[in-house]
């Protein structure tokens, strides 16, 4: 059975960039799952599958979603296909939710690897301002929310530096790459 890597972090921490970089690299037995979201396909940077609320509810009713939740005005889901991939021995990386980690832990137990992507408040503010999706009040609210969801019961990857460093750290946590220490 593979591992489900539940990648969490505040909006603007770089989850989508990290997942996009991981998709560009070749890793055997590693898949990045798309989320099903009731948000337009061109909204934001996330590579997701856009569904209407009706489509989402039909999939949920037919047990086609392994996990689902509601946040920020949208419904989010992970397709049941991730269970097939895990049972086939693939490690699966998903863009998870900090608030719904317990739901993932209940379903996947020891197969779950919770990873929190962290970023310093100043860099987070700068990234949110640069992407231009939120106004000042919304940015303040996102910063406040980020402060109330510190990493807990999870491995951390600091994303203040380069994206490639963050990807390397994630691969080390997943056991897909050895950590090399510089000799002193």
Curated annotation (Swiss-Prot):
Q: Which InterPro entries match?
A: GK/Ca_channel_bsu (IPR008145), P-loop_NTPase (IPR027417), PhnN (IPR012699)
Superkingdom field: Bacteria
Q: What is its EC number?
A: 2.7.4.23
Q: In which pathway does it act?
A: Metabolic intermediate biosynthesis; 5-phospho-alpha-D-ribose 1-diphosphate biosynthesis; 5-phospho-alpha-D-ribose 1-diphosphate from D-ribose 5-phosphate (route II): step 3/3
* Signal peptide extent: none
Q: Which residues bind ATP?
A: 9-16
- What GO biological process terms does the UniProt entry carry, in alphabetical order? 5-phosphoribose 1-diphosphate biosynthetic process; organic phosphonate metabolic process
User: What keywords tag this UniProt record?
Assistant: ATP-binding, Nucleotide-binding, Transferase
**GO MF entries:** ATP binding; ribose 1,5-bisphosphate phosphokinase activity
Job of this protein = Catalyzes the phosphorylation of ribose 1,5-bisphosphate to 5-phospho-D-ribosyl alpha-1-diphosphate (PRPP).
Instruction: State the protein's name.
Output: Ribose 1,5-bisphosphate phosphokinase PhnN
Q: Which organism is it from?
A: Salmonella arizonae (strain ATCC BAA-731 / CDC346-86 / RSK2980)
């Amino acid at each position: 059975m593979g591992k489900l890597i539940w990648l969490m972090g505040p909006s603007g921490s770089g989850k989508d960039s990290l997942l996009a970089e991981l998709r560009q690299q070749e890793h055997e037995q590693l898949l990045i799952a798309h989320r099903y979201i009731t948000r337009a396909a061109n909204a934001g940077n996330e590579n997701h599958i856009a569904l209407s609320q009706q489509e989402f509810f039909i999939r949920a009713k037919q047990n086609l979603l392994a996990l689902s939740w509601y946040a920020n005005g949208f419904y989010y889901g992970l397709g049941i296909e991730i269970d097939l991939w895990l049972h086939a021995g693939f490690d699966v990386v998903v863009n998870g939710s900090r608030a719904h980690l317990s739901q993932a832990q209940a379903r996947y137990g020891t197969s779950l690897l919770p990873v929190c992507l962290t970023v310093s408040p100043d860099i987070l503010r700068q990234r949110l301002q640069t992407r231009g999706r939120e106004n000042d009040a919304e940015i303040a609210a996102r910063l406040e929310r980020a402060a109330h969801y510190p990493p807990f019961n999870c491995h951390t990857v600091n994303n203040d530096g380069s994206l490639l460093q963050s990807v390397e750290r994630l691969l080390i946590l997943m056991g897909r790459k050895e950590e090399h220490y510089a000799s002193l």
